Amino acid sequence: MSLWKKISLGVLIFIVVLLASVAFLVGTTTGLHLVFSAANRWVPGLEIGQVTGGWRDLSLKNIRYEQPGVAVNAGEIHLAIGLDCLWRSSLCVNDLALKDINVAIDSKKMPPSEPAQEEEESGPLNLSTPWPITLSRVALNNINIKIDDTTVSVLDFTSGLAWQEKNLTLKPTRLQGLLIALPKVADVAQEEVVEPKIEKPQPDEKPLGETLKDLFAKPVMPEMTDVHLPLNLNIESFRGEQLRITGDTDLTVRTMLLKVSSIDGNMKLDTLDIDANQGTVKASGTAQLANNWPVDITLNSTLNIDPLKGEKIKLKVGGALREQLEVGVNLSGPMDVALRAQTRLAEAGLPLNLEVVSQRIAWPLTGDTQFQADDLKLKLSGKMTDYTLSMRTAVKGQDIPPATITLDAKGNERQINLDKLTVAALEGKTELKALVDWQQAISWRGELTLNGINTAKEIPDWPAKLNGVMKTKGSLYGGTWQMDVPELKLTGNVKQNSVNVNGTLKGNSYMQWTIPGLHFALGPNSADIKGELGVKELNLDAAIDAPGLDNALPGLGGMAKGIVKVRGTVEAPQLLADITARGLRWQELSVAQARIEGDIKSTDQIAGHLNVRVERISQPDVNINLVTLDAKGSEKQHQLQLRVQGEPVSGQLSLTGSFDREAARWKGTLSDTRFQTPVGPWSLTRAIALDYRNKEQKISIGPHCWLNPNAELCIPQTIDAGAAGRAVVNLNRFDLAMLKPFMPDTTQASGIFSGKADVSWDTTQEGLPQGKVTLSGRNVKVTQTVNDAPLPVAFETLNLSADLHNNRAELGWLIRLTNNGQFDGQVQVTDPQGRRNLGGNVNMRNLNLAMVNPVFSRGEKAAGMLNARLRLGGDVQSPQLFGQLQLSALDIDGNFMPFEMQPSQLTMNFSGTRSTLAGIVRTQQGQINLNGNADWSQIDNWRARVTAKGSRVRITVPPMVRLDVSPDVVFDATPSLFTLDGRVDVPWARIVVHDLPESAVGVSSDVVMLNNDLQPETPQTASIPINSNLTVHVGNNVRIDAFGLKARLTGDLKVAQDKQGLGLNGQINIPDGRFRAYGQDLLVRKGELLFSGPPDQPLLNIEAIRNPDATEDDVIAGVRVTGTADEPKAEIFSDPAMPQAEALSYLLRGQGLDSNQSDSAAMTSMLIGLGVAQSGQVVGKIGETFGVSNLALDTQGVGDSSQVVVSGYVLPGLQVKYGVGIFDSLATLTLRYRLMPKLYLEAVSGVDQALDLLYQFEF
């Protein structure tokens, strides 16, 4: 074999072995595992926990990768490739899933990267794939990426795509739980702080006019060729839920739907639907990135941002970007505005026609209107190089008189000429003509004219008539300005006082002023300013001579006179002042006399004196007799004394000091200081040493103490307050008796507090100050008067603490009640300026509710034990709570309770942003089971639900109502609505309503309730609306005894409440009953109450007939009541039918008009019946006096057999009844004894004797 053949054979064998090795490593499961094992071993920082499966079902778990500045942790990566597709020249990925991925990148720790080389332009990008690529499913679950201070989290993402040639299709995609936390701009700016530079205009810098001229000399939209996108993209459906971006602003998108496609430059937006916390957006449209770039976009939005909450926006964009573009905007809601605009972006000069129209614009947008503009019309037409502007509107407001505003102007890129701005108001006109030019510097020239202004109608207490003119001109350039007022003139009168203002002045930004003369005169009062504040010389005089300020302005009074002079030079100025005022008053403030006198010079040192004396300062709750301030000396040695005499504060202080100009340092001493305050006198125990160093911007305050009879506050060591420093404050004693002047009479507090505060700060470093505050109470007792009864609360231990260290704030407390339980806990906030994570715990141990028993009446009490072990979590925006709160052995006995409560319990379990409620309310008869849950995972959209179920719970409202209820109700609560639904069964009830007093009268429907200020009370409405939908079922054993009616009730009512109010729907029936009226015993034959709306307006359908046993001739006579409760209609009826007079006779007498009985006997029987009917309560009270219960006087029988019957209970189960005939002397004695609740033994003795056994049925 030749050498060439050997070499060729060796190369061939090597290639075959290499290809076989690659095929083994890549194409087999074993080889693939070997590749990952090698990577796990040889790749620095890589660690793979587990590898299973092959290319068809490959799973990598517990992957870690770490490099400087980069840390990656992956829980699981799954890849499934369809190898069969390779035979069809396509690539198919059946599944690509990433789960529990955490990536942390710190760019500061990463090695610097090499500068990127500039890539040469290679023409338009064209993306195309030679083989079809299909990704059936890509899924991301629990992905967290942090890059420096930016965090991106994805809860769940699923999608898929198909790519063939240039066509890329994104399959239906779902994204849930996206959070992008951006750093706040202030934090970034603080890290990248740069010393500001003041840039002065450069000689070659273009003026604003030239810049605008160059801008509009060419089209705003440059010449553009057709745009060819590298891909044809089709997004079939992209749905997002709970997408949130935080930072300087917080944006939460609840739901989002996007459908869009782009084919050969033709873009089509089928659907864009966004529902966010700031509002909703719906958009659709088309656009073409070629030819003239036509567009057609429609957008509709509803805002949910104060004050534009509820504002609806409709935007329409049409036309073409390179031809005429038309934009229309309609706003409706709190602000109604219509805007129409046409422009040509591809034409030089930017042609623009803009029109804004609004019938009404008000501010604020919600609530009471303070400003309003009606019929607003604004129009701008032309080009930016030559345009006209006009505006018309009428305005009014709370403090603004009605006015009509007219504006006409012309302008170009160099200037705007305000032809006329007219404000027609107050019976006159205010006109402004001006020219503003920015071709070189920004300069202006204008004239303001007042003509015929009259305020008599708008301000009748301060009428004024004014005319005037002011001319002004000036310029602004490079941060400096200058202004010249060549003419200022104002004439007229104010409340019969002549007004005269005239003068001229000029000045600049260097505070150099030349004032030839300014004169102000109002009636006899005048003020003059004249002089110059020049570059070197200072010579300015100001004088005031106001002998009659009374009513010159509303609420102003008194007199004032004085002069102020400025002399010297800029390097050595001198200020002299001498001002005197007497009888000054402004609104409710009055000063009897004031004097200011001073002479201050500044040469190499500032020296002089200043004396201020103010006598009798008075206003509500303030009465100061005298205030004096004396300051004198020089920089090297000066002193100040302040004296105050009066109420509520009086006292004095003395301050001495010296200033070193070279060192820019002031040293002083505060001494002889004491004040009298409403909480007692305060005085310094030692002088305070003060030291201010201006170069360091730091002040030192020496140790001292403030002493009060009930308190002592001390600074034990020197405080250096500057950019950095530390302060320690000790509260050695604080008696709560000091608070008595500020507490209501119903509250009393006693005890001693002591504490300490230690705070340090350093503004040159990032983060918050450091500090700790502790407060401890001894013998603390608070007594609150509730319902004229004292409620004392004594504290055995009362400790409070607050700590701020290492970017963590902590608040702790320990409260032990005397002879009671304990309440303690701590709340921690980590990173208060950033994430504000919460931590800590709250504990309650054996808190006994018996502590409130003193406020209960005799025989009433409360019992129960409250315990809680709670733990805080989450952050301030989304707080979390864990643990349990339990109220056990709860028992409240009181007349206000509708049932007799037995020991009950209530338990609440908290698990993060959710909680559950379980409880049992036990009563003497029956119990109520409570269950519920709450969720505050969305703090602005929390919800709570409580269900109550019970069986025959006895409810008692003495002395009228006893009933059994079986509730099955559900109460739901959200921030916007309370809802009560369910059913309440009343199987048994006894309702007894006593007669109203004869003097009782109903409340008039037009009554108006007044408050303490004699103003009508505003009806209180619930801040959150309440909707109810309850069904009340009245069972077969419900009886009522009210106003002579004894009856049984049945029926069903539906109780509904909404924003319209409370309403009842349903029917109450009266199956049987009796009604005592007019001395007669009427039987309810038919009774129906129909409810359909307000509860006080039922429809009545009632028939009550006379007892047939007491009516002759088998006649049925009665009363029929129909109509509404407020307008009932009553009529008498009979069976058989007969005239009304005959029916009335049978109703009242029990017999007809043609009866053989004498009229006197009939009249006697009727009158006795009527009299007995009116004396029932009087007889009952007499019986109670003699120990006979339920003593009653009644009539029985008809005609000659009528009797007067007296009955009563002499023993709890023994009833005695005695009857005497009205027209004969026959008497009947009846004894009835109750053997069992419904079994009676009755003995009757009269003309006949009888012994009966009676049993009572109810059906």
Swiss-Prot record:
<protein>
    <recommendedName>
        <fullName>Translocation and assembly module subunit TamB</fullName>
    </recommendedName>
</protein>
<feature type="topological domain" description="Periplasmic">
    <location>
        <begin position="28"/>
        <end position="1259"/>
    </location>
</feature>
<keyword id="KW-0997">Cell inner membrane</keyword>
<dbReference type="Pfam" id="PF04357">
    <property type="entry name" value="TamB"/>
</dbReference>
<comment type="function">
    <text>In addition, is involved in outer membrane lipid homeostasis. Likely transports phospholipids between the inner membrane and the outer membrane.</text>
</comment>
<keyword id="KW-0472">Membrane</keyword>
<keyword id="KW-0843">Virulence</keyword>
<dbReference type="GO" id="GO:0009306">
    <property type="term" value="P:protein secretion"/>
</dbReference>
<keyword id="KW-0735">Signal-anchor</keyword>
<keyword id="KW-0812">Transmembrane</keyword>
<comment type="similarity">
    <text>Belongs to the TamB family.</text>
</comment>
<keyword id="KW-1003">Cell membrane</keyword>
<comment type="function">
    <text>Component of the translocation and assembly module (TAM), which facilitates the insertion and assembly of specific beta-barrel proteins into the outer membrane.</text>
</comment>
<dbReference type="GO" id="GO:0097347">
    <property type="term" value="C:TAM protein secretion complex"/>
</dbReference>
<dbReference type="InterPro" id="IPR007452">
    <property type="entry name" value="TamB"/>
</dbReference>
<comment type="subunit">
    <text>Interacts with TamA to form the translocation and assembly module (TAM).</text>
</comment>
<dbReference type="GO" id="GO:0005886">
    <property type="term" value="C:plasma membrane"/>
</dbReference>
<keyword id="KW-1133">Transmembrane helix</keyword>
<feature type="topological domain" description="Cytoplasmic">
    <location>
        <begin position="1"/>
        <end position="6"/>
    </location>
</feature>
<feature type="transmembrane region" description="Helical; Signal-anchor for type II membrane protein">
    <location>
        <begin position="7"/>
        <end position="27"/>
    </location>
</feature>
